[in-house]
A protein has these predicted regions:
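Short, glycine/charged-rich "phosphate-handling" switch motifs in NTP-dependent
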Residues: 160
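A short, proline-enriched helix->beta-strand linker immediately N-terminal to the Walker B motif
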Residues: 106-110
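Conserved ABC ATPase signature
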Residues: 86-91, 95
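A short, surface-exposed alpha-helical micro-motif characterized by mixed small hydrophobic
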Residues: 154-156
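ABC ATPase NBD coupling module
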Residues: 11-29, 47, 55
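Conserved ABC ATPase "signature" region
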Residues: 62-82
């Protein structure tokens, strides 16, 4: 496939993922389908959330931990200070997906691309994750590109639904 990426009216020509401009990375964040594969098992939750903040120079060392605790609690992982110290293997799939959502929110993006974020979760957890997306859309004035095969989830969350033929 081919195409162009425009952000605020500017063409963001990208040939490789490492060439993606920092402005784009801050403005557009991803939440991936697999909560088990999107977090590195050797790092704590704190590391996963702190890394983008350090990279974009958004928080200093003293601001970092309280902000991460706040993010974790915002996505329903309480107490946040306990979750910040956990490793991915110590959490359920739903908890891991909440960490991925918190990481995406950490940079205060304008757009989140969520690629099948509920497909690998238990049915009992899916609604909780959809509620988090709905809440953050309203609270953060956020655009969510929610990619799914589940039309009921799309109908619940979306203002507009686009169905791709052979996509």
């Amino acid at each position: 496939s081919a195409g162009s990426i425009y952000l605020n009216g500017k063409n963001k020509k990208v040939t490789e993922s490492r060439n993606v401009p920092l402005e784009y990375r801050k403005t557009v964040q991803m939440v991936f389908q697999d909560p088990f594969g999107s977090l590195n098992s050797i790092h704590t939750v704190y590391h996963h959330l702190a890394r983008p903040l350090f990279r974009h120079k958004l928080k200093n060392q003293t601001e970092m931990f309280p902000y991460i605790v706040h993010l974790l609690e915002k996505v329903g992982l309480t107490p946040g200070d306990k979750f910040a110290k956990k490793f991915p293997h110590e959490m359920s799939g739903g908890e891991r997906q909440r960490v991925a959502i918190a990481r995406a929110l950490s940079l205060d993006p304008k757009i989140i691309v969520a690629d099948e974020p509920t497909s690998m979760l238990d049915v009992s957890i899916r609604m909780d994750v959809l509620e988090i997306f709905a809440k953050m859309r309203k609270e953060n004035n956020l655009t969510v590109l929610f990619i799914t095969h589940d039309l009921a989830s799309a109908r619940y969350l979306a203002d507009r639904i686009i169905v791709l033929k052979n996509g």
